[in-house]
């Protein structure tokens, strides 16, 4: 699973105890939180002994009574004992993200600053493809040397 930072929120799916949940990837959250309205009624929960900070004022905060089996977005095996409260969407915190091997990368530019300026002046929008409808190739392709020395591609 990969997500480029954009106007869209980075959400992904996880399967907890066989039930699928969608949640927001939240690197600022220490723990994962399941929305109270999505928590299955037959799954045991208990009043949390600690409160949640950073999500506003949550009047009812629970925690799963059990450590639950979880499969990440690419079937990474993990376990979680999520918090449960009234929030609009589930949050995948660092407790799960670390187990899933999540990374944040900021790749070095593929092109020189000069070529980037030229492309921007010509109307190129990063993340969009080239062409009239911006639907062309979005990532550079890798040139391959013709090892059989046939046709174009063999360096003389």
UniProtKB/Swiss-Prot annotation:
InterPro entries: Aspartic_peptidase_AS, G_patch_dom, HERV-K_Pro_peptidase_A2, Peptidase_A2_cat, Peptidase_aspartic_dom_sf, Retropepsin-like_cat_dom, Retropepsins
This protein's UniProt keywords: Aspartyl protease, Autocatalytic cleavage, ERV, Hydrolase, Protease, Transposable element
GO process annotations (BP): proteolysis; viral translational frameshifting
Record's keyword annotation contains Protease: yes
Domain called G-patch: residue spans: 111-156
Reaction catalysis annotation: Processing at the authentic HIV-1 PR recognition site and release of the mature p17 matrix and the p24 capsid protein, as a result of the cleavage of the -SQNY-|-PIVQ- cleavage site
Domain Peptidase A2: 21-96
Enzyme Commission (EC) number: 3.4.23.50
Post-translational modification: Autoproteolytically processed at the N-terminus. Expected C-terminal autoprocessing not detected. The sequence shown is that of the processed Pro protein.
Enzyme class: hydrolase
GO molecular function (one): aspartic-type endopeptidase activity
Active-site residues from the entry: 26
Further comment found in the protein's record: Insertional polymorphism. Provirus present in 16% of tested individuals.
Assembly description: Active as a homodimer.
Family under the similarity heading: Belongs to the peptidase A2 family. HERV class-II K(HML-2) subfamily.
Function: Retroviral proteases have roles in the processing of the primary translation products and the maturation of the viral particle. Endogenous Pro proteins may have kept, lost or modified their original function during evolution.
UniProt protein name: Endogenous retrovirus group K member 8 Pro protein
Organism this protein belongs to: Homo sapiens
Taxonomic classification: Eukaryota, Metazoa, Chordata, Craniata, Vertebrata
Gene: ERVK-8
């Amino acid at each position: 699973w990969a997500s480029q930072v954009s106007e869209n929120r980075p959400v992904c799916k996880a399967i907890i105890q066989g039930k699928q949940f969608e949640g927001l990837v939240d690197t600022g959250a220490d723990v994962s939180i399941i929305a109270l309205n999505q928590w299955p009624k037959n799954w045991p929960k208990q009043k949390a002994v600690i409160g949640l900070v950073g999500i506003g004022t949550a009047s009812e905060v629970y925690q799963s009574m059990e450590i639950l089996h979880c499969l990440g977005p690419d079937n990474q095996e993990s376990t979680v004992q999520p918090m449960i409260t009234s929030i609009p969407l589930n949050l995948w915190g660092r407790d799960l993200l670390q187990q899933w091997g999540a990374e944040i990368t900021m790749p070095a530019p593929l092109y020189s600053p000069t070529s980037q300026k030229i492309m921007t002046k010509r109307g190129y929008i990063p993340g969009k493809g080239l062409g009239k409808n911006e639907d062309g190739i979005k990532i550079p392709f890798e040139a391959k040397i013709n090892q059989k020395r046939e046709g174009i591609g063999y360096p003389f």
